[in-house]
Amino acid sequence: MQDTSKQYDAVVDTCKSLFIKKMGDYGSAWRILRLPSLTDQIFIKAQRIRSLQQNDVRKVDEGEVSEFIGIINYCIMALIQLEKGVVEQPDMSTLEATKLYEEKVSVTKRLMEDKNHDYGEAWRDMRVSSLTDLILQKLLRVKQIEDNKGKTIVSEGIDANYQDMINYAIFAMIHLNEDKS
């Protein structure tokens, strides 16, 4: 589990670094996005990953890793939007956004550690394609919850689904990094 924690942190560092750089380029323009818009952005990334996994020919020179980073960062933005609400104008400094980013990652990592303990790191025996499918399944669930105006009868809420997608994407990146080495 110690290895998992270090690997998890390394993936998060990569994602957070890109998030901060994009905050420098664009500011917090993402703060105007409603949750369904963020969900759709994540869906596009996950669909592209699935297409890359199924097709041999690529017309755009970006691989799975950059798409998984996008999924992680968009999910964290969605968690921030759930907490802070949508705004009409960008309103957040890089410092404040980074602090919120780190808070969301911390809670999500704790969830991963708890589930990892209970499931015995079962994700290590899963294929990246299966993790991609789980992300797509979670996205379909989130879309349904959004269509139901956020109401669920017995299921966990949108935030838990975003957290699971973050963890699945991080697991996929750990697998892809291990395959490289």
Task: Locate predicted features.
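Intrinsically disordered, low-complexity regulatory regions
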Residues: 1-181
